[in-house]
Amino acid sequence: MMKKILLLGVLLLSVALVAPAQRADNYPPQNKNVVIDHTNLPIVWLDVDGVMILRDERITARMKIIHNGDGQVNYADTVAHPGQRIDYEGYVALRYRGNSSFNHSRKPYSFRPLDKPLEEGGTKQKVKLLGMGKDNNWALLAPYSDQTMVRDLLARHMARPWMEFTPDGRYCELYLDGIYYGVYILVEVVSKGKHRLNLDDPGESGDDLTGGYIMEVDRYENPVYVSSYHPVTNSGASISNRYIYFQYKSPDYEDMTAAQIQYIQSRIRAMENTFASTNYQDPATGYRQYIDVMNFIDYQLAQELAHNVDAYRLSGKFFKRRDSEDPRFKMVLWDMDLTYGIPYYHGGWQTDQWSYRLNDTLFIKGDNYLIPFWWYKLNNDPAYTAQLKERWAQYRRSNIQPERIMAVIDSLSGVLTADGAIDRNSPAWPRWGGYVWPNNYIPQNYADAISFLKQWITERIAWMDEQLGFDPNARELGDVNGDGNINIADVTLLIRYILSGNATDVWVDSSDCDQDGNVNIADVTALISFVLGGSWP
């Protein structure tokens, strides 16, 4: 016990020693002379009247957002261009946010809209921002290492159709105290709310006590719950001098009662005890009673497609509803900027490694934060890996197709280039052709950065296809027109093919729906049954 206490003390001290101090000038850009005339992005003004922004304490700021609508022009000179749409104007409680992202020259922010200044007793209020649902907890992300500025939104976009909740975000351009700070992403955060995670606050007993909670696997930041189990190597051996830490995100630890703290700790402990047991794979009594398996699979595939070297061990947010609604833990995607081939460390630039198998590398490199042992256990359960492969095949027939991903990248990057946002951001924060931590590849310009991202994703998908047994040239049974979906359009095309024998764009191998070696009216019957929710013969 004393050894654990000493270790935690050393970790806390090391964090304090490396954390950079706030600066009175609020970290202005290298070039403070960049200005906006007009832009297709919303314009966000923050004014703190020269007051130093802090990391751990909020200050009062004034915020104004001009947003004339998607695709419309926004003008910075509101006198010359009166009558523009004000998306929000009022006070906010502002502070810096982030861990590794806070170490960059350009800082991300957390803010909460207020009814009046903090000095006058202001309280947070829920507002709708840039078309995103009302809430009182927001962030301004500052993409810096990712010079394409699309990775975070790209990961969210691809995960959103599969996961219950994935925070949304919008590009904007930011002024702070009249100085242009560049392109930011105004985002929802992982929090409780009608338009976020619709969770009840936990009560004191019974079913009310069992939800809702938001926790996070992350760094040691007191207070934390320390797992009873150490992380493991790729062969399953315990790494006894490393620990897994769970942070309390909602409710905040100081707002929780003793009963609530004890409950969520005991629930995590019960889950981990089950994973550590010899019969953890049992469908009825094993880990499946504690986690939403498909949600964990979706989370894993999102992290692996991006080859996030921080995955599972940092920003590992998960939540739990009340038992009467759903007793299982579910993961939420967050912090996806150092992904898709950026990091030089831990093999993050490579396309042919699994992130969930990084513990050996992390330990050798002296990293203090390793992946919880349950991800090792999951990926050594044949039933889980079979579901993982099936889900990957679903992804590949849906939105995780190279051409669709390239279209999303083109759409996101197009927003940034259409009216000069990149051309303003780049001189404010000059980086092209120079090293920016932790990039393994050094892009020479924006087109080069986008080209590298596309090539990396293409290679990553090909490798994952090979590892997970998916043949991109094969067509799913019933997908007669080969569009990746099975619906009434396939029924129509199959009927036309049977009647005429020469319909174009027919995938004959996918048309033998009853798998008897012939394509005839019986296949139409089988296909209609499947489209209506049945199963194949």
Label the model's feature ranges:
Residues 470-537:
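Cellulosome-associated attachment modules in secreted, modular CAZymes
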Residues 108-112, 136-142, 149, 157, ...:
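Structural recognition of the beta-strand scaffold that forms the well-ordered cores
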Residues 63-79, 150-164, 262, 266-276:
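Zn2+-dependent metallopeptidase catalytic core
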Residues 33, 40-42, 52-54, 58-59, ...:
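Middle-to-C-terminal accessory/interaction subdomains
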Residues 17-21:
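Sec/Tat signal peptide C-region and signal peptidase I cleavage site
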Residues 22-150:
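Conserved NTP-binding catalytic cores of kinases and kinase-like/nucleotidyltransferase enzymes
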Residues 112-118, 126-143, 163-167, 179-301, ...:
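Internal "kinase-insert"/substrate-recognition segments embedded within catalytic cores
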Residues 5-15:
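Sec-dependent N-terminal signal peptides
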